[in-house]
Each structure stands twice: as structure tokens, then as C-alpha cells.
């Protein structure tokens, strides 16, 4: 059985290079798709201080996945409640 590797996590652990990214706070999959092509290492979808709900997160994650680029998505949930984390995981 093969194990999935999180390349962003591995690169952060290695510490060999600076990693650059942006916060996505507009709730728009078109913006997420455009920024996926900008060459950032990571893109963080913010649910804490931005108007991103579960549907917005899912659509932005689909846009990032469809881009087939190395930008790794990260989601910041608005709290530590398990149901919030589960919703983000269910979104992708």
C-alpha cells in the first residue's frame, strides 16, 4: 500500500528553501484558479476572517485541483471544533 506524501509538509520540514504563498479571502474560485497559476508554493483559504463558507472552500479547492499545479492548498478553519475541521476535510 502506498502512502500519500504531503509535499508542502515535507518541504517545510526540510527547511532548505523559503516557501511563498497567499491567503485567499475573497471566496471566489476564479481568483483561486488565477492565483494557482501564479507560482506560489501554498495558497491558504481563510474561513476565520474571510467570508468563505463550506461551499466556497469546496469550489476553491476544486479550482486549485483542476489547475494541476504544485501550489498546495491549506484551509484555516474558524475554530478548533471537530465539526469545523471535518467540514474542511470533506471539502477536499
What are these regions (language model features)?
Residues 1-92:
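Expand to "…catalyze enediolate/carbanion chemistry for C-C bond making/breaking, isomerization
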Amino acid at each position: 500500500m502506498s502512502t500519500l506524501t504531503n509535499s508542502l509538509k515535507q518541504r517545510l520540514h526540510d527547511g532548505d528553501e523559503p516557501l511563498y504563498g497567499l491567503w485567499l479571502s475573497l471566496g471566489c474560485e476564479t481568483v483561486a484558479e488565477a492565483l494557482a497559476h501564479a507560482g506560489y508554493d501554498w495558497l491558504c483559504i481563510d474561513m476565520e476572517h474571510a467570508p468563505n463558507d463550506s461551499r466556497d472552500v469546496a469550489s476553491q479547492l476544486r479550482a486549485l485541483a483542476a489547475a494541476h499545479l504544485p501550489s498546495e492548498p491549506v484551509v484555516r478553519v474558524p475554530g478548533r471544533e471537530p465539526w469545523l475541521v471535518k467540514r474542511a476535510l470533506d471539502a477536499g
